[in-house]
């Protein structure tokens, strides 16, 4: 089993109920999963990581999704106890439509590394998308 989100950037802003099908979940997948599945006891933190990282990599047949010597450093650093309300105006990605607007959640993504390079940083509440184009796998 996997937990996935839709990483499809779009600049077309319109009300949620008028937007194309599908939800852009780049900024909401981790906090909503922590809030609704981990904090409620449905999943352990390890099971969440397996379903969002290890299992998708295994299904896709790519050598990713684990932290181990010699492996590629694709890492998301999360503060699982930080609380905030989802505000799509603060999203670093182009997609802004979300059914979670205003939802109170736990779990703030602080950094994202792809191929060992920081591509996203939220340092002291200042979100910075360092690279729009993610390095190739």
Residue ranges and their predicted role:
Residues 15-18, 72-134:
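C-terminal cap of metal-dependent C-N hydrolases
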Residues 6-81:
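His/Asp/Glu-enriched, well-ordered alpha-helical/loop segment
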Residues 1-3:
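Conserved small/polar residues in nucleotide/adenosyl-binding loops
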